[in-house]
């Protein structure tokens, strides 16, 4: 503590022969908390290492191209945009046009909100010549599936059409029993041994041989029956031909015999008449 003098003043020490204290330099204003060891080397010093430039990562901005136009929110979504809208019809053409344009603007904004509606129409008109867009339009006109949801819905409809009726199978015990019997019948076939399989094949071959022998015997008997029928038909034809010849000869002789008998009868009558007269 400085001693106070009698007149109330403090004694001032001599600072002329005292050396000043050294302090480190201040950091640059851009980085106030930076250490001096990490400070950038000066340009004049040749020992400085060149600092690589900073890389800027660019974001891929969305573009209105053919793939975006044919996506789920693109042209396929137009099929269902006007499902719930009702147009007034004749006499209200202006109002109907306004509603149509309003729905189209909403569709365009959902697909690509960065463009105005006029610019969007120009861009879509230019993309109309692309092959992808034309194929998408053809599939829409032919009512073919385009998006994944369309394929899923078609598969569900086909499965419902081909699948059994749940109401019928729920109350019909025979259907369930038949399916269970098929399962039980398929299980023992898997557990067959080689000897059993060979025995089954032998039985099949024996059955086939027996069947072929039976077919041969049946064919031979049929051939014999055919020959017998042909012989019998030949005999019948000969008999019928003989009868036809007899009938053809008979009618020519009959009139001669009848006329001869008539003449004899007349001669006898004349003789009787003469005897009566005598």
From Swiss-Prot:
It is found in: Cytoplasm; Nucleus. The modification Phosphoserine is found at residues 191, 219. One of its GO terms (cellular component) is nucleus. Residues 226-239 have a biased composition (Acidic residues). InterPro entries: Csm3 (IPR012923), TIPIN/Csm3/Swi3 (IPR040038). Signal peptide: none annotated. Expressed in brain. Keywords: Cell cycle, Cell division, Cytoplasm, DNA damage, Mitosis, Nucleus, Phosphoprotein. Residues 259-278 have a biased composition (Basic and acidic residues). Its main location: cytoplasm. Residues 64-140 are annotated as: Interaction with TIMELESS. The keyword Nucleus applies. Pfam families: Swi3. The modification Phosphothreonine is found at residue 233. Residues 1-59, 155-197, 216-278 are annotated as: Disordered. GO terms for biological process: cell cycle phase transition; cell division; DNA damage checkpoint signaling; DNA replication checkpoint signaling; mitotic intra-S DNA damage checkpoint signaling; positive regulation of cell population proliferation; replication fork processing; response to UV. Plays an important role in the control of DNA replication and the maintenance of replication fork stability. Important for cell survival after DNA damage or replication stress. May be specifically required for the ATR-CHEK1 pathway in the replication checkpoint induced by hydroxyurea or ultraviolet light. Forms a complex with TIMELESS and this complex regulates DNA replication processes under both normal and stress conditions, stabilizes replication forks and influences both CHEK1 phosphorylation and the intra-S phase checkpoint in response to genotoxic stress. Belongs to the CSM3 family. Interacts with MCM6 and MCM7. Interacts with TIMELESS (via N-terminus), which impairs TIMELESS self-association. Interacts with RPA2 and PRDX2. This is TIMELESS-interacting protein. It comes from Mus musculus.
């Amino acid at each position: 503590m400085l001693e106070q003098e009698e007149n109330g003043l403090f004694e001032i020490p001599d600072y002329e022969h005292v050396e000043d204290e050294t302090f480190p330099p201040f950091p640059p204003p851009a980085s106030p908390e930076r250490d001096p060891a990490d400070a950038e080397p000066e340009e004049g010093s040749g020992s400085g290492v060149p600092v690589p430039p900073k890389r800027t990562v660019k974001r891929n901005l969305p573009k209105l191209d053919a793939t975006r136009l044919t996506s789920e929110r693109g042209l396929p979504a137009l099929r269902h945009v006007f499902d719930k809208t009702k147009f007034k019809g004749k006499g209200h053409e202006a109002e109907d046009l306004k509603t149509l344009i309003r729905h189209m603007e909403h569709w365009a904004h959902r697909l690509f909100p960065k463009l105005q509606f006029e610019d969007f129409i120009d861009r879509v008109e230019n993309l109309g010549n692309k092959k992808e867009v034309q194929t998408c339009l053809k599939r829409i006109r032919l009512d073919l599936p385009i998006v994944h949801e369309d394929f899923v819905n078609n598969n569900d409809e086909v499965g419902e059409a081909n699948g059994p009726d749940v109401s019928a199978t729920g109350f019909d015990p025979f259907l369930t029993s038949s399916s269970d019997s098929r399962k039980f019948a398929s299980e023992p076939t898997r557990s067959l041994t080689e000897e059993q399989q060979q025995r089954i094949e032998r039985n099949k071959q024996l059955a086939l041989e027996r069947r072929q022998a039976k077919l041969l015997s049946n064919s031979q008997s049929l051939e014999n029956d055919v020959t017998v029928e042909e012989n019998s038909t030949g005999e019948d034809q000969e008999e019928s031909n003989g009868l036809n010849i007899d009938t053809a000869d008979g009618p020519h002789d009959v009139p001669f015999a009848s006329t001869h008998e008539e003449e004899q009868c007349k001669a006898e009558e004349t003789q009787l008449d003469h005897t009566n007269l005598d």
